[in-house]
């Protein structure tokens, strides 16, 4: 953790950001030690840097985080206890967020990057985006090229609508599918 944090500090000190701003990106909780996550939270607070990572993408990942962080009630708490939800923060996926996790995301002002193509390609599930929007969570679109297949946000938007229709028809008919304006 110390070496990674020191390298990040050196890079931040040596780089010039006239047209860009750095964002701290811990891959996800299972790939980072507690010390690294804590250090990144402190670095984000000290330098006012935003944070982005993955959250509640699939059920296997959620179970792994629970086994690694038994002191937490849900995945987002692992980030929050390290101060990583306090800065401007984007969490990708958020497919399986329980209501308590949604409450925390809303309280911290976290942005959700909905990546429907990636979620579909990895069989992660269908995020309840309409329900997130209805409760006031901030949601945007993500292309996630690691598992998505395009940077074309119009295709991502169409897939977000399509996925919400499948969720509405097959999983939860209490929340209407996304409209074009919502997507």
Task: Pin down the residues of each PLM region.
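Histidine/acidic-residue-rich catalytic or RNA/ligand-binding cores of hydrolases
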Residues: 59-72, 101-106, 123-132, 149-165, ...
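Short, acidic/turn-prone active-site loops that include or flank metal/cofactor-
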Residues: 57, 116-120, 145-147
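Short strand-loop junctions, especially beta-strand C-caps/beta-turns
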Residues: 27, 94, 115-117, 142-144
């Amino acid at each position: 953790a110390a070496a990674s944090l020191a390298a990040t500090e050196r890079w931040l000190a040596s780089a010039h950001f006239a047209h860009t701003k750095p964002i701290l990106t811990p891959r996800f909780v299972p790939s980072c030690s507690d010390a690294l996550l804590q250090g990144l939270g402190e670095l984000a607070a000290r330098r006012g840097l935003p944070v982005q990572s993955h959250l509640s993408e699939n059920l296997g990942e959620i179970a792994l985080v629970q086994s690694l962080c038994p002191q937490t009630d849900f995945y987002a708490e692992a980030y929050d206890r390290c101060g990583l939800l306090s800065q401007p923060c984007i969490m990708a996926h958020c497919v399986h967020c329980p209501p308590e996790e949604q409450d925390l995301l809303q309280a911290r002002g976290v942005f959700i990057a909905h990546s429907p193509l990636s979620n579909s390609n990895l069989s992660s599930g269908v995020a309840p985006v309409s329900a997130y929007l209805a409760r006031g969570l901030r949601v945007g679109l993500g292309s996630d090229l690691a598992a998505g297949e395009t940077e074309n946000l119009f295709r991502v938007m169409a897939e977000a609508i399509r996925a919400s229709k499948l969720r509405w028809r097959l999983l939860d008919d209490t929340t209407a599918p996304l409209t074009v304006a919502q997507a």
